[in-house]
Amino acid sequence: MSDEGSRGSRLPLALPPASQGCSSGGGGGGGGGGSSSAGGSGNPRPPRNLQGLLQMAITAGSEEPDPPPEPMSEERRQWLQEAMSAAFRGQREEVEQMKSCLRVLSQPMPPTAGEAEQAADQQEREGALELLADLCENMDNAADFCQLSGMHLLVGRYLEAGAAGLRWRAAQLIGTCSQNVAAIQEQVLGLGALRKLLRLLDRDACDTVRVKALFAISCLVREQEAGLLQFLRLDGFSVLMRAMQQQVQKLKVKSAFLLQNLLVGHPEHRGTLCSMGMVQQLVALVRTEHSPFHEHVLGALCSLVTDFPQGVRECREPELGLEELLRHRCQLLQQHEEYQEELEFCEKLLQTCFSSPTDDSMDR
C-alpha cells in the first residue's frame, strides 16, 4: 500500500486499546471513526520502520496516561509482535531500495551514447536521486545511505555532473542527509563538499543549482562549528554577499536569512565582517527596490551593531546616509502590517546608532 505522508515521521500510530474497550474518537484510523467494539478491526496499521515504531510508542503513551496495571492480552501481544516485525521488515526494504538507487548512480556515464539514450540515462539517475532524497528524510535511512558510501558518490561525481538536474538533486540530497545530524555533517565536510557547494552557489549558471547548494551549505554551517570554520576559511561570507546581490529573489532571501542567523548565533565574527566592508554592502542592498529580503538584511545590520561599537561607528558614516534612509523606510512601512518585523529592525537601528541619550524623537 502507498503510505501518504511517509516522509519524516511516519503514520501516527497507537497501540490497540486495552481490554476495557474505552475509546477516544481520535483522528481517524482507516475509515472507521465509530465504535471500537468489533474485535481488532480498528487496529492501526503497523509502522514500516523503527522511527514509526517509536512514534507509535510515544502516541500510545500520550493517549493513555497512567493506565491501570493489567496483564497484556494475547491479541495485544500478537499485535505488538507483528508491529515490530513489520518495522524491521520495512527498514530492510528501504535499505534495499537505497542499494538499488546506488547501483544506478554508480554506473559509468554513457560515453558516446546517442541523444535519446543520454536523456533516458539522465532521467533514470535523476529518479534515483529523488527517491533517495525521499527516503533519507528518515534519519535512520540517511545514516544507512552514508554507510553505503552514498555520500562519497554524491560529492565525488554528482556535484560536478554535466547535467544541472543531477547537480541540484545531489546538492539537495546532501542537505537532506546532513540536516541536524552532526555525524553526517562531519563526514560531508571531510569529503570536501563545502568548497564544491560554495563554488556552485557562486558560479553555477543554473539558478536551481545555486538555491539547492545554498540549502546544503546552510545545513552544514548553521549548527556545526567545524562547518562554520571551514566556511570562514573558504571566504563563505563573501560568497553569501554576492548571492544577495543577484537578481534571483529566492537566492537573495535565503542568503540574507542565513547571514542573519549566522550573525545572531556567532557574534564573535562581527569584526571580521566589518573589516570586509559588510556594513556598507548591506546598506547598499537596503537602498535597492523594496523587497521581502530587506527584513533579513536589516536584521543582519542590527546584529552587527548590537553591543558592538565598531559596527555603530560604521553605520554613522555620513557618506552612507543611513539615518535618513531608515527614517524614510519607517514612514513607508508604518501602514503595512506585514512588514512589522522589518519596521522594528529599522527602529532598533535608529535607536542604537542615531539616538543620543536625550533624544526621544523615535515617535512613529
From Swiss-Prot:
Q: Record's superkingdom? A: Eukaryota
Gly residues compositional bias, start-end: 23-42
Coiled coil (UniProt feature): none
Give the encoding gene's name: HSPBP1
Q: Which residues carry this modification: Phosphoserine?
A: 356, 361
GO MF terms on file?
A: adenyl-nucleotide exchange factor activity
Q: Where are the ARM repeats?
A: 137-179, 182-222, 225-264, 267-306
Name of the protein described by the UniProt record? Hsp70-binding protein 1
This molecule's function is given as: Inhibits HSPA1A chaperone activity by changing the conformation of the ATP-binding domain of HSPA1A and interfering with ATP binding. Interferes with ubiquitination mediated by STUB1 and inhibits chaperone-assisted degradation of target proteins.
Q: Region (Disordered): which ranges?
A: 1-75
Q: Which Gene3D superfamilies match?
A: Leucine-rich Repeat Variant (1.25.10.10)
Q: How does it assemble?
A: Interacts with the ATP-binding domain of HSPA1A. Detected in a ternary complex containing STUB1, HSPA1A and HSPBP1. Interacts with PGLYRP1; this interaction blocks the cytotoxic activity of the PGLYRP1-HSPA1A complex.
Provide GO CC annotations from the record: endoplasmic reticulum
For this UniProt record, the keywords arranged alphabetically read as follows: Phosphoprotein, Repeat
